[in-house]
């Protein structure tokens, strides 16, 4: 093997060059190691990160999967840490069930988990618009916890019809490299990840979320429910809609009642020139001849 070929096997700069050029990562002046630049905590997150996975580097792993690995000698691969990530997926169907699940996850377990609204149109949860995830480090651990959570869901007054199952890795990785039961870690991948692990620095998020973020989060959940036709959100607004319904106008039919105040329908008499009360009437003036 030539010296040049040997250099190509560890040419980290070429692997990450598009991300450097786009400003997604920067090369630190003190030691030339790489830092991700776009990992700030969102101020309007869809998820309640109840307890985070210790040592989780998810923003980096997604960049590694999508942008870096295809440029390495190993080709596109699922990061080895992600192959060890087993998730219990819980599918609440309404905002009422989501709040009940949140309370259950906060009070009954100490497992790493999150729950919230599913905005990704391609995700399996999008059918129900809400979801919960419990993170596990092995299939064995995941299956043991799945049995426990299913039992608790079945015995819960609100969550007794909610589905739960076990999956491997992130949805995006399952889509990019289908059939997670066939994922493996090659020797080339190990070499690439060993090199990158040394060069990348991480700001791992702390567990939990502060009160001001949770306040906005719960408002976002309720607004999402209202926007997606989930009327159980009315239980959190004293039965009042968040968004005022439009006033509807229909021609008055002889012998019928006016529209219900609930749907704000106004019956208008067909008499020419009549304008309903509260509606401004526009008049057109003729210009005087000079």
What are these regions (language model features)?
Residues 102-105, 144-157:
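Short amphipathic alpha-helices in soluble, non-transmembrane regions
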Residues 94-95, 135-143:
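Helix N-cap motif at beta-to-alpha junctions
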Residues 122-138:
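Histidine-centered divalent-metal-coordination microenvironment in nucleic-acid enzymes
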Residues 282-289:
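Arg/Lys-rich low-complexity patches in intrinsically disordered regions that function as generic
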Residues 1-103, 114-121, 182-185, 193-271:
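Charge-rich, low-complexity segments
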Residues 110-111:
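Catalytic-core elements of nucleic-acid end-processing and repair enzymes
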